[in-house]
Amino acid sequence: MTMFNKVVKEFQWGGHKVRMETGEIARQASGAVLLDMDDTVVLATVVGAKNPKPGQDFFPLTVDYLEKTYAAGKIPGGFFKREGRPSENETLTSRLIDRPLRPLFPEGFYNEVQVVIHVLSINPEVPADIPALVAASAALAVSGLPFNGPVGAARVGYKDGQYLLNPNRAQLAHSDLDLVVAGTERAVLMVESEAQQLSEEIMLGAVVYGHEQMQIAINAIHDLVRDGGKPEWDWQAAPKNEALVAKVSELGLADLQAAYQLRQKSARSQKLKEVYKSVAAKLAEAGVEADGVEVDNILFELESKIVRGQILNGEPRIDGRDTRTVRPIEIRSSVLPRAHGSSLFTRGETQALVVAALGTKSDEQIIDALQGEYRDRFMLHYNMPPFATGETGRVGSPKRREVGHGRLAKRALIPVLPPADEFGYTIRLVSEITESNGSSSMASVCGGSLALMDAGVPIKAHVAGVAMGLILEDNKFAVLTDILGDEDHLGDMDFKVAGTDAGITALQMDIKVQGITKEIMQVALAQAKEGRLHILGKMQAAMGGARTELSEHAPRMITVKINPEKIRDVIGKGGSTIQALTKETGCTIDIGEDGTITIASTSSEGMAEAKRRIEGITAEAEVGKIYNGTVLKLLDFGAIVNILPGKDGLLHISEIANERVNQVSDYVKEGQAVRVKLLSTDEKGRMRLSIKAAKAEEGDVPVAAPQAPGAGDAASQQQQQQQQ
């Protein structure tokens, strides 16, 4: 008799075998599911507070995705030998899981909910994000919490005209698409993707295909809940105070409508604050007892109805535009004099200062992932300080939102970057958001494309991004191009599309309601393309192509190819040679395992000197060639002469002059520069040199008579004895 009431469900999903179980591990959590997808094993747990905190006016959901190094059979680095702060991938995956789960909790549910997903085992070929999302959904479903799920998810690839379901890492490396889609049985809720300039039709097809295939996982979760789920919570939303709603509407509706006739964000925000304060004061004067949070929520609902109603009725949007118009755009390049590339991209009240810096291979980011260590030559960092929205706040390490926006912009630009063998620089872009009123991540894409071209990075084409919104009510809907911050909060869907004039490079969708059909998404994508092409036209007019010359402040780069066996000679004992080269020439020198040496410096003279010295260190001595040598040591039967760095040979006494030489020191001295010809090299690399042969070949003296038989053999024997 076991102490566990374990329920297990197994199913085949594409090329993967999946096993879900509940009832054995983490039984004190509200819900827990262990999911195994071809040896990638994740444990998802959910805990929900039984009661909300007093005064709580928002839904406090936290999602934490945590990777354990033991999952890959590793011990963490560093002094403490344990996992530290979340990596960028953990942060991004936490956001990926949060986004489709959050809209499925009922309105008015303010109990704290924490979802924690641990990666316990990793198959390097099976990414853990899809198993983690499905496991989190299953844990919520079995917990009994008020949750309108379950949610399914799928990764979709695209190659040779075919969609791939949950491709492994090897397949993803050659796929033209990496798209993650999540949703319920009836609707898509979230899309995250990177693409190689694909058409809207292919992208939409991938979303539909992924939604169809995720039903397998959703059905398995239903089976798990049926056999292993906990009782559903008896939770009901608090009834609306209709009398208070009517009173607040009476006091504030007209003023709110007037506020939304103000086109400038700062003036509108100020007016809205005044309305909120005024309504609270009037309620107090009238003797109406009301919770401030409840009043604010009613006013926000009124705002939403005003904005949505105006748009659906065909009236102008908040800032006076129609639904298809992009805000005015201003572009300026080479903004910063010492930066390698920079641009200032302004679209309405959203502005991004994007700066490019070029570095060498040693500047690449080394990422120690569960799947193994790898290097990243392209970084994009997004920062949005509080002053961008006219507020005060914390300034410091990036928050989840900043990390996510930076990754989206990076995804959009990766497909147009030149390969490393054509442009060997490490590239870092930093987007500093200096103003924000919606769509700052897409401003980062546009500004990033311009900054790359300004830096002389030969990208394939400009990339532009546009943020879209959608409002759906009954059978009416409106798609909004280039949404404002307020439209983002009040709409039913926001999606961001980035790409070139040839196709989409990145797509991100977040859908807050169910009922958005394939046809609606088709209209939205077509309108987004129209907006993207408009922005691309502005960017093309401002900068038609990448600069042909790098900034004078950017490092120049040359490459030298050497025999890989010579790498140790360039490095030297304990790194002494490479350190001396770097210090004396002022260059950065990177050595690849294949023998490719990259020399970078802002000084062309320093690069030339470093190249000359490396070629000297690695040069192979050629028989029959004449060299400038230096006498290192005198011997009774000749001298040791250095002809190349680390290359010494024997100048036999018989090869010094045509006449008989009795005393070597009568002809050469230690430290003397001499011209010598390499006569031969034996199987051990020992070299025979000749001054008289060099002079004869260069015309200084007649060609010497052939050497007597056996003389060469005697000299060779003497050289061997000396070097041994």
From Swiss-Prot:
Cofactor needs: Mg(2+)
Domain of life according to the entry: Bacteria
Domain S1 motif: 624-692
GO molecular function: 3'-5'-RNA exonuclease activity; magnesium ion binding; polyribonucleotide nucleotidyltransferase activity; RNA binding
UniProt-annotated binding residues for Mg(2+): D488, D494
Keywords recorded for this protein, A-Z: Cytoplasm, Magnesium, Metal-binding, Nucleotidyltransferase, RNA-binding, Transferase
Residue ranges, compositional bias (Low complexity): 701-724
Region spans: Disordered: 697-724
Name listed for the protein in its UniProt record: Polyribonucleotide nucleotidyltransferase
The organism of origin for this protein: Ralstonia pickettii (strain 12J)
Gene name, Swiss-Prot/TrEMBL: pnp
